[in-house]
Amino acid sequence: MQLSDFNFDLPDELIARYPLDTRSASRLLHLDAHGHYHDHAFTDILDLINDGDLLVLNDTKVMKARLKGKRASGGAIEILVERMLDNQIAHCHIKASNTPKAGAELFVGENGIKVTVQGRHENLFVVEFSEPILSVLDRYGQLPIPPYFNREAEEIDTERYQTVFHDPQKIASVAAPTASLHFDQDLLEKLAAKNIQKTFVTLHVGAGTFMPVRTDDIKNHIMHSEWCDVPESTAELIRQTKARGNKVIAVGTTATRALESAAQANGGKIDAWTGDTQIFIYPGYQFCVVDRLITNFHLPESTLLMLVSALSNRNNILSAYEHAVQSKYRFFSYGDAMLIDQAV
């Protein structure tokens, strides 16, 4: 399939650059298994999910991963921490007027904390901080909100660009699992009262989630690598859910990629798994675990649009997106949501 097969026109004013006042106040577009779409409020999810179904959510936490600083010569630089290798060494993106070389010393924060470039790892820099990374990020970092917000991170993002159920010990993402941003505590309690179970996986979202596809034939695209964990407790709940004929509902493309990666690693069966994944899901992929997906509206020609097109199909998705544009749904990370059923 060609990259252009996944293009659509999106008016700039439909990009949601700030969250709504209430998390669960978003709209929801339900795309059913036959390709028909239906307009809802997000809280209607209570009526669209059945007793005994299982929600799978990503419990990662977003780091304040963006640091502004300078070279020893005084030139401005920006560091985005992609992955911590240990307490003081990380893989990073670095923006600078000239590419830093191994041995270059950079300085961040008011006290000029030293960051030494050790070398390269693929398209990333390997750097060593003179102090513990999380401490530096906590003091001087900014939340790495998406580039299409066209603004700096603000105080509202500190709360609203995190899920209400994130695990504070799992602080390693550079982007939020945005489908989960619609869930507030009240909605989660109402889902539990209806006997809709929830469980968690972890996928630490990398900056590659924002990288454009640069190949005309999508099969030639190489996915970025992200670390994920599907614990045995989650795998067991999924097996039980499937055994009684209920649905597994992934909340977000990150949860989807974690679940399907675990299944691929275990011969198509869901089992516990931890590791790096580069899974690329596009039309033709046969899902092993996920029956339904709650997700936001995605960018044209993005791998995430290809993923949702694999669960339904490309024509269904593009038709639903056309309706969403005409109906002025809000798009992207702070936007509205879809509930997508696997096409029959």
From Swiss-Prot:
The gene that this protein is the product of is queA
Q: Which cell locations does it reside in?
A: Cytoplasm
Q: Which GO terms describe its biological process?
A: queuosine biosynthetic process; tRNA wobble guanine modification
Q: How does it assemble?
A: Monomer.
- Enzyme Commission number(s): 2.4.99.17
Q: Which residues form the signal peptide?
A: none
- Family note: Belongs to the QueA family.
Keyword Cell membrane assigned? no
Q: Which GO terms describe its cellular component?
A: cytoplasm
Going by the UniProt record, its keywords in alphabetical order are:
Cytoplasm, Queuosine biosynthesis, S-adenosyl-L-methionine, Transferase
Under catalytic activity, the entry for this protein gives: 7-aminomethyl-7-carbaguanosine(34) in tRNA + S-adenosyl-L-methionine = epoxyqueuosine(34) in tRNA + adenine + L-methionine + 2 H(+)
Stated role: Transfers and isomerizes the ribose moiety from AdoMet to the 7-aminomethyl group of 7-deazaguanine (preQ1-tRNA) to give epoxyqueuosine (oQ-tRNA).
UniProt protein name: S-adenosylmethionine:tRNA ribosyltransferase-isomerase
> Which pathway does the UniProt entry assign to this protein?
tRNA modification; tRNA-queuosine biosynthesis
Q: Source taxonomy lineage? A: Bacteria, Pseudomonadati, Pseudomonadota, Gammaproteobacteria, Moraxellales
Short name of any one Pfam family annotated for the protein: Queuosine_synth
Q: Is Cytoplasm one of the keywords UniProt gives this record?
A: yes
Where would you say this protein principally sits, based on its record? cytoplasm
User: Which organism does this record belong to?
Assistant: Acinetobacter baylyi (strain ATCC 33305 / BD413 / ADP1)
GO MF entry, a single one: S-adenosylmethionine:tRNA ribosyltransferase-isomerase activity
